[in-house]
Structure formats: C-alpha cells, structure tokens
C-alpha cells in the first residue's frame, strides 16, 4: 500500500515538474519559448498545443483554444477572466443546472469562486459532460452571476404565464389561477361592496403551476374585478360578473304544487331570496349552497293559467336577479317525433303520456286530422297507442300532407287541456319496384306512395322533382293526388330502361323505372330528292341516336343515313348501291324496330325543268335509283323528240337531242313537253310519278346576248342561245329581218337581212339604237331588250394617186362572178326541168359547198363569241368573205338554196 502512495506522489511531482508552462505575458500577449507547449487541463488531461508563429516568436491564443472550458490560469502572472457563454432556462421552481464555465480554475487548478448577489454558488464538476453544476433556489426576476466583482452572466428566471381565465368557485369561496412559473403571484379584489380582505394570500403548489386564493366575499353573488400580478408586476385584470343563474327545476311539478328545488350557479344569498312564478310572487328558502335553492310553487288551480312553459326568476338580496327558465305542471308534453323508416308509423316520445285521450295532426293552413286512440297497436287503420308514460305509437293516414306538422295531445285529466304543439316533418315515400311504359312522345305517369300531398306547413306547394340525372329525362309533376299517388308528365325520350329519381325538397325519396316503347316501322314513301320517308310509331326525335339498316335479300346489310326524325315518321338517305329492293330495320338507342318490307325503290326524277336546248344538245336528267336502266334497253323522248342516251348512272341520265333540222321543226317547238323514259327490260321499274300530271320538260326559249353591226349589204349577225328555225321570226324595230340563216353547229348565232335598211340610212348612224325581238313557233320571246349601234361602212373612197382604185378591181371581179353564176343558175333550171335527178346531184354538191362555208363561218364566230357584254366579232374583211356574203344575198341563189333544202 505504501508503494502505491509513493508512486502517486512521484507522478504528481513529475507532472508539476514536467508539465509546467514556459509562457509569459508580454505587452498583453502570451509569449512562449517553444512552438509546442504542454498544458494540464482541469480534468487531469494533458494536451500538446502548437503555438501561433510570428517570426521566431511563439504566441498562445487562449480565446481560440478549443478546451478553454477546462483551461486553468497558466501561472501566477497569466490569469484568465472566467466566462459563462450561456445558461439553461431557469423556471421559478429553481433546481440543479449544468452549464459551461470557461477558464474555471487558477494556476493551482482550484475552481474560481462565482456568486449571486454576494451569495457564493456551490459548484460541482460533471466529468461525463465536462460541465459544472450548481443548485438555484426558487425565485423570479433577474438572475446575474459575477466573479471577483466582474459580472459574467446576466439572464432572468422564466416569466410567469396564465393562459386561461382563473376559476372562481363561489360554492367554496376559492379563486384558482393556473399557469406556469407562478412564483410570487398575488391578486387584488375590487367590488361595489365593501370587502374585508382585498389582497388575500395565495397558496402556491410545488410546480408553480397553480395558486389558490380564499376569500369570504367569493361566496355570494357580486360583480368582481380581480387584478393579478406576477413577481411584483401587473399581469392582467379579470372580470367575474357572478350573478345568480337558474338551470332547471328538479323533480315533477304536479297539480298541487309545493316546494321545488332549482339548480344553477351563484344562488347563495347573504340575506334573502325572492322569486316570481309567471305573474305571481313566490317565496324561496335561504341555502348554504350556491348551486341550488328551494322555492314554493302554487297549485295549478291557484295559479289559474295554462300549465305549460311558466317563467320562473329569483332575486338575491334584492339586488341580483337571475335569468328566466320555464317550467310546466306534469301535463303531457311531446319532446320528439321520429318516423320508422319510410312507413306510416311514428314514434312519439315525451312525458306524462299515460293519461292522453286524444291526438290531432295539424297540417297546411290549419287542416286538422284527428287520430283515435287504440287499445292495441294496429297497422290496419290510423290511430295511436300509448306504449308507456314516455312513448306513443302513431299510425298516420297515408294522405297526410308532408312537410312540417303540428301534433296536439290532450291531457286526459278532469280539466280540458291541450298540450303545446310539436312541429315535426313527414317526407313522402315512393313505393318501391314501380315500372312504366311510355311512347317516345311521353306520357302521364301515376306514381304510387304514401304522404304524396306535396304541401308544406304553410299550405304552399312543395314540388316533387323527378329526373334521371343531370341532362337526363324529366317528369314534370302535376297537382298532387289523394296522398297515395301523384301524376307527372314524362317528356319525350327513348330507351329500354331509365331510372327516375324522385326528390322532395331536394331530398331523395325513391325511384321508379321507365321504358319507352320500341320503334315500329310501317309504310314507306319516296321523296323527290331521293330520300325515303318511313311512317311508323315511336320513332323518336333524336337523329344522332338513330340508325337505319337496309337489309338485302341475300342477308347483306348496309346503313342508311337518318336526316330527320319525328315520333311518327322519319326520313333517311338510301345507301349508295345497285340494288333497289330491300327491307328496313330502325334502331333508336338500344331498341330495334320490326323488319319492314321488302320495298322496291322506283326511279325518281329530281329536275323536272332542265331547260332542253331548242337547237339540240345534251340533256341531263338528275334523279335517283336508275339501277336497272341501261343504254341498250332504255329510250327517252321529250314530246316527240327522241333523246339519244349517252350515259346512265344511279343518279344521272345524259342524252343528246339531234340538231334542229327543218324536217324535224314541228317537234322542236317551245314550251312544255312530256318526258317519257321507257325500258324494254320487264324487270325495270317505271319512273315514279310524284304528281298525276306526270313529268314535263321545257324547251328553252331563245335569248339574245349580242349583235354585230349592219354591213353594207344590210346583213346583221345576232348572237344568243336556242336559235331553232321552226317558224322563226326576227323583228328589228317591229320590222322583219328576213332570210335568217342559223349556225346549225352551235345554234348560238344567226344572220338575217334588215328589210328597213334604206329607211335607216336617213338617221345619224353613229347614234341610232334599235330594238330586236325573236319568236319561235309563232310565239314571241323577249329575253331582254337588246340595242345595237349602227356603224356605216365606206362603200367607195377616192384615191388621189393615178390608176384605178382597189374597189374598181373588186367590182370587176364580182361582176364577172355574178355573170358566171347567172349562167350557171339558168343552166340548172333547164336541166332541172328536163333531167331532175341529174340536177339534184349537181345541187347536192353545191349544198355541200354551202355547208363547208357555213362551218368555217361558225368556227370563226366561236373563236370570238362569248356571252355577256363582249362585243360581237368584227366582220371578215377579206376579199373572199365579201364575195361569199354578196353571193348569199342574190335572190335567185337564195331561192335555189331554199328549194334544195325543202
């Protein structure tokens, strides 16, 4: 043992000899002789510290030393001022607190002394946390720590707080304040009355979370004001208007009256208590409790008024008046009414039901329904049955109006009495499992249920709402019925099943199912535009939900397009195809119709007035269902004029009328002519006649679009359309324009000879305008009034130079040709007389020459001619043109041409 002590002593001596610092204080800095110094800390720990270097000198920075909470003074000269950088929160209860203490010891490693207001704190060292621990007594307010006269910590105890209003128990006369850090809490009481003790002492609990104050004044009602201070400083002021308060009457008040106990608060008087019962004064007994008081109530007979809801008040010490409560004698009183599910049964709860003799339900505008008492509960007829003194079973009539009802109960005593009305609500109920069928146009539905009289307690109508959801079907209710049903008008719709929800004041009360009738197809009709009209029933009005299926004989199907629909008919467009016999099935929503047909489509013509060109040309016949017509088996005539078929499709027939030659002119007259389409195929349907009058086409009347100028030979060219030469007549200023010649290739131009040419010469040619009209087949057709401007031609012009003018050469050539033609014509006349066949052959070659000339002329016109306001083409001024035109004006030649044509 001695060896151990000697070893420890040597160890301490070695530490003192070899762990001694070589640092000194120079000019406010700690200068050391070595770069690496060894320090012994307070907890016996030896640390090697590297010094800061400045040249060849070494310095120690104690403030940045990481273990300064364990660093002692280095020697007698180098002393550090202790520091407490932080301190835990200090509740007013005090206790043990651990804290960090920097530079805690002197160079001999003794703990430096710290004190609070000259009271030295005892310190201990917690080696596990390297912290010092001290104990603090309960207190409040500022908390300061100093060392050697230097303050090293300034803080405070935690501040007291009272989160809730203090509790005043006037039955015990105690005020309780609850909160935290309530050390040194005091109160001051203020009142209108004189107080014995305005500043009572409080009792603080160990946790400083509750303090109680007892005062005799708290036992009686008063209007208190209490100021609370914590740690000598005002905290808050509280008001306690503690006036008497009645809650209820205990027990049962029978007809004889008597002493009744009333419970409440602040009911202890100092002197006396008075009360009122209705309009009568009652006596009350003094009590030592603030929570109850006893008062004497008169009998119902002495009271002399209705025994329900009688107001009661008390007044304490003639100054403090309580609130008012209402009490009743022990008479029947309804407290609640509840319906059993959706039935006609209602449970009534309340008090004093044993003597009930009659019940009345009041609805609407004071409509009364008496309910008879039954000896036993029954569901067969309306009535009520008393189950106990607190419950009544009621079976209401099913035609009782829903809404807020008033229930009246008779007392059953010796005196006539009616209990107060109790308002309760009855909701209509729909009988479950109801289903209805309707046409697509809608129907009136009778919905069964109970309590279906839809009025409220004021007699006003409360409509039932019936629909299948947002955006769905609606059934608009009519006036309510006898309570067992109501009627609503179902709107148009379709579909096999719809759930209709019924709402009363937006509350769902049931539902029923509606199914619309499936569609039915009957007869069919064809329309002019090619659509098909189907007649039937329950076809609906929704085109977007409609599907028409066309079923062919081989079972193949294709959908038509429904374009219009009503409840009794629909119109659909037949699908494109080449089969005209089929059956039809119509689907509306999820329901399909019967299979109607088969029906055979007849060809139908849509354009009944296609304006057939009078001069011949292409005629387009628009229609539908030309399935079986072919070019080889079909013939078309318009009047007596044949129209040669060029093409046939399902919807169009194109045919060509030959040019209007004179030999056919009686058939090419203007006006309306019957159209006949026939087929040699016996399986081809005849054209469908929309009207008994049949189909009639009109030949287009002639029109005039422009004219040329009158040339020197009085010849004018007229441009237009449908220039047929059947009984053709042209008038210029009501004078005939003779010898008309029609362009037989286009029938859009003709030339004629102006008969009043000589008369026109007297006018100023540059300004004169003339009217032109044209008629075909003896009828005048004035498409428009056209005017043309006469332009004079220069017949001769003198040439100042020597020699003959060009016109003289032209005249000479014309004269020679004229003599030749006269000779040729005379020869032909003689040959015709003797040899007719031979002359006809010669004239036929001349006619071919004439046709070639006209064809060339027509080609030239077509190059320049357009409809509208474009000017007519200028005449060909070539020598050949003038010779040809002059020859065409010779009467003998024209007469020959005419005879040959005829």
UniProtKB/Swiss-Prot annotation:
Residues 25-803 are extracellular. The chain crosses the membrane at residues 804-824. Gene3D superfamilies: Immunoglobulins. InterPro entries: Dictyostelium_Tiger, Ig-like_fold, Ig_E-set, IPT_dom. It is a single-pass type I membrane protein. Coiled coil: none annotated. GO terms for biological process: aggregation involved in sorocarp development; altruistic, chimeric sorocarp development; cell motility; cell surface receptor signaling pathway; cell-cell recognition; cell-cell self recognition; heterophilic cell-cell adhesion via plasma membrane cell adhesion molecules; socially cooperative development. Glycans are attached at residues 43, 144, 184, 223, 272, 279, 288, 358, 389, 398, 437, 559, 628, 644, 706, 753, 764, 771, 799. Disruption phenotype: TgrB1 and tgrC1 double mutants show strain segregation in chimeras with wild-type cells. Residues 825-902 are cytoplasmic. GO terms for molecular function: transmembrane signaling receptor activity. Residues 249-323, 603-680, 704-788 form the IPT/TIG domain. One of its GO terms (cellular component) is protein complex involved in cell-cell adhesion. Keywords: Cell membrane, Glycoprotein, Membrane, Repeat, Signal, Transmembrane, Transmembrane helix. Pfam families: TIG (PF01833). It comes from Dictyostelium discoideum (Social amoeba). Residues 1-24 form the signal peptide. This is Tiger protein B1. The gene is tgrB1. The tgrB1 gene is highly polymorphic. It is found in: Cell membrane. tgrB1 and tgrC1 are involved in kin discrimination. They play an essential role in aggregation and subsequent development.
